[in-house]
UniProtKB/Swiss-Prot annotation:
<feature type="binding site">
    <location>
        <position position="315"/>
    </location>
    <ligand>
        <name>coenzyme F420-(gamma-Glu)n</name>
    </ligand>
</feature>
<dbReference type="GO" id="GO:0005525">
    <property type="term" value="F:GTP binding"/>
</dbReference>
<dbReference type="InterPro" id="IPR008225">
    <property type="entry name" value="F420-0_g-glutamyl_ligase"/>
</dbReference>
<feature type="region of interest" description="Coenzyme F420:L-glutamate ligase">
    <location>
        <begin position="1"/>
        <end position="243"/>
    </location>
</feature>
<dbReference type="InterPro" id="IPR019943">
    <property type="entry name" value="F420_FbiB_C"/>
</dbReference>
<dbReference type="Pfam" id="PF00881">
    <property type="entry name" value="Nitroreductase"/>
</dbReference>
<dbReference type="GO" id="GO:0052645">
    <property type="term" value="P:F420-0 metabolic process"/>
</dbReference>
<keyword id="KW-0630">Potassium</keyword>
<feature type="binding site">
    <location>
        <position position="54"/>
    </location>
    <ligand>
        <name>GTP</name>
    </ligand>
</feature>
<dbReference type="Pfam" id="PF01996">
    <property type="entry name" value="F420_ligase"/>
</dbReference>
<feature type="binding site">
    <location>
        <position position="146"/>
    </location>
    <ligand>
        <name>a divalent metal cation 1</name>
    </ligand>
</feature>
<keyword id="KW-0436">Ligase</keyword>
<dbReference type="InterPro" id="IPR029479">
    <property type="entry name" value="Nitroreductase"/>
</dbReference>
<feature type="binding site">
    <location>
        <position position="108"/>
    </location>
    <ligand>
        <name>GTP</name>
    </ligand>
</feature>
<comment type="function">
    <text>Bifunctional enzyme that catalyzes the GTP-dependent successive addition of two or more gamma-linked L-glutamates to the L-lactyl phosphodiester of 7,8-didemethyl-8-hydroxy-5-deazariboflavin (F420-0) to form polyglutamated F420 derivatives, and the FMNH2-dependent reduction of dehydro-F420-0 to form F420-0.</text>
</comment>
<feature type="binding site">
    <location>
        <position position="105"/>
    </location>
    <ligand>
        <name>a divalent metal cation 1</name>
    </ligand>
</feature>
<comment type="similarity">
    <text>In the N-terminal section; belongs to the CofE family.</text>
</comment>
Length: 443
């Protein structure tokens, strides 16, 4: 591409042409796609963009595999399941793409076989670009396309899964719009727009797997560029990394006991949302046996923990523990002291029944204790959903009178431990899966 063309390109708004290439033969393993494309369109020019359907790239690269069981092929290409609806799976595949069936396709391929996506679509695009440069002496952009569904939208469209020589993203952040308003979040997915334009002329069943787009030389780069991988947003940065049902299931199991926190303040609103989840727990007799005391000030936390420490030391000394042993045990309370936020859950027996015998009265209290535990578990799970770490510690149960006195609580409020809350100092470790069968008896 000449310097004159490159200099003029950014200001061009004259429109563009896009057309499909007829006459391409059925692609076989080992075929040179660049030579096939050059033969079909020898008049390619600098600044053109080639839009190449991934199916023919896969065929040329020998990505057609025998697979009587398509589901097994999908399993092999899957890194994680994002969502599942009946037989349909939306997954992240080994290329980092989130798509239906990991890109495994049983169409346009002989019976008993499936097409896998190219192993490295960016490398595939680079190879085609280099081949066209060698064959025709032209400097073009190449995009490998595949068909995707889209969140919140019906229907399918083509997007870029591989690219070479194309400015795949147009980052407008830091600029202004026509009214002078700052652009703070606008990054245009140029390669996807080009892929969709090509799909208009290629179609889905017309046997036209390659399109040429001409008239937008500003999107073609001198070097190969970052490729389409630069467009893939990682799961950690994705606000919707799981489907609804999958997110609900994961939320229940992602709670961890977190004992070390950063100094980042805890959003009181997040804790209140967790409390709102806590009080949806089951409870006997249509009661609401939960109360949650939120210690939001450092002064209230220190006052409570100092009083609890003194009560604990007194208990340990009565047990005959040495001063060294006492000091060692008391240090275990640091998880509460180092937390930037504490919640003290309490049990109230309002609405409980009195039966007049020890057995049934004990069972009645146990029902309320179980309900309180369910509320605390809801709290912990909801805090995890707010990306907050937590640790339930039993210590307030051993000095309830002290806790009630320091916090000014009614006599009928029974503290049921304390929950340390904060932003985890490090990513919680993955928990090994437990086999449910080890905890089940069937009758």
């Amino acid at each position: 591409m000449s310097d004159e063309t490159r200099d003029a390109a950014p200001g061009r708004r004259d429109g563009y042409r896009v057309w499909a290439l007829p006459g391409l033969p059925e692609v076989q393993s080992g075929d040179d796609l660049a030579k096939l494309i050059a033969a079909a369109e020898p008049a390619l020019a600098d600044g053109d963009v080639l839009l190449v359907t991934s199916k023919i790239v896969s065929k040329a690269e020998g990505r057609v595999v025998e697979a009587a069981d398509r589901e097994a092929a999908i399993d092999a290409e899957t890194v994680r399941v994002v969502a599942r609806r009946g037989p349909l799976r939306i997954v992240e595949n080994r290329q980092g793409l989130v798509m239906a069936a990991a890109g495994v396709d049983a169409s346009n391929t002989p019976a008993g076989t499936v097409l896998l996506l190219p192993e490295d679509p960016d490398a595939s695009a680079r190879g085609i670009r280099e081949g066209l440069r060698d064959t025709l002496g032209v400097d073009v952009g190449v995009i490998v396309t595949d068909t995707f569904g889209r969140p919140w939208r019906a229907g399918l469209t083509d997007v870029a899964i591989g690219a070479a020589g194309v400015r795949v993203l147009d980052d407008l952040r830091g600029g202004t719009d026509a009214y002078g308003n700052p652009l703070g979040a606008t990054v245009v997915a140029t390669a996807d727009e080009l892929a969709a334009a090509g799909d208009l002329v290629k179609g889905k069943a017309a046997g036209l797997p390659v399109a040429v787009l001409r008239g937008l030389p500003q999107v073609v780069a001198e070097d190969d560029g970052e490729g389409a991988r630069a467009m893939v947003r990682g799961a950690r940065d994705d606000m919707f990394r799981l489907g609804t049902s999958e997110a609900v299931r994961q939320a229940v199991t992602q709670r961890r006991t977190v004992r070390a926190f950063t100094d980042e303040p805890v959003d009181p609103g997040a804790v209140r949302r967790a409390v709102a989840a806590a009080v949806t727990a089951p409870a006997p007799h249509h009661t609401t046996p939960w109360r949650f005391v939120l210690l939001e000030s450092g002064e209230s936390r220190t006052r409570l923990l100092d009083a609890m420490r003194d009560a604990w030391i007194a208990d340990l000394r009565r047990d005959g523990k040495s001063e060294e042993s006492v000091a060692k045990r008391v240090r275990r309370g640091d998880v509460l002291r180092n937390a930037p936020y504490l919640v003290v859950p309490c049990l109230v027996m309002d609405g409980s029944h009195t039966y007049g015998d020890v057995r049934r009265d004990a069972a009645e209290r146990e029902m309320f204790v179980v309900a309180t535990g369910a509320g605390v578990q809801n709290l912990l799970v909801a805090l995890a959903g707010e990306r907050l770490g937590s640790a339930w510690v039993s210590s307030t149960m051993f000095c309830r009178d002290v806790v009630r006195e320091v916090l000014g609580l009614p006599d009928g409020w029974d503290p049921m431990g304390a929950v340390a809350v904060g932003h985890p100092a490090e990513e919680p470790k993955a928990r090994p899966e437990r086999d449910a069968e080890a905890f089940i008896e069937v009758r």
